[in-house]
Amino acid sequence: MKPMYRSRSWRRKYVRTPGGRTVIHFERKKPKIAHCAMCGRPLNGVPRGRPSELRKLPKTKKRPERPYPNLCPSCMRKVIKAQIRAGISL
């Protein structure tokens, strides 16, 4: 095993080959789930994936198609209400 693969930053995936041997394939781990910028709740509709995987997705699959996609829906409502009450236009 290469020294770079001894680190636990690589995920070990055991694969059975057609010849019957079990070999280890090393993959990078998936990043953590996206969180709301205000309250820290996990965001729905945002995929977990490495940048190389996310690059292959269409734009609409990468984040919610609404204002403030980096906020959860309840925080988004609070921000929009605060802006309207302050008289700031979007």
Swiss-Prot record:
PROSITE patterns: RIBOSOMAL_L34E. It comes from the Archaea. Gene3D superfamilies: 6.20.340.10. Pfam families: Ribosomal_L34e (PF01199). One of its GO terms (cellular component) is ribosome. Keywords: Ribonucleoprotein, Ribosomal protein. GO terms for biological process: translation. The keyword Ribosomal protein applies. GO terms for molecular function: structural constituent of ribosome. Residues 45-69 are annotated as: Disordered. PANTHER family: 60S RIBOSOMAL PROTEIN L34. HAMAP family: Ribosomal_eL34. Belongs to the eukaryotic ribosomal protein eL34 family. NCBIfam families: PRK04059.1. This is Large ribosomal subunit protein eL34. The lineage of its organism: Archaea, Methanobacteriati, Methanobacteriota, Thermococci, Thermococcales.
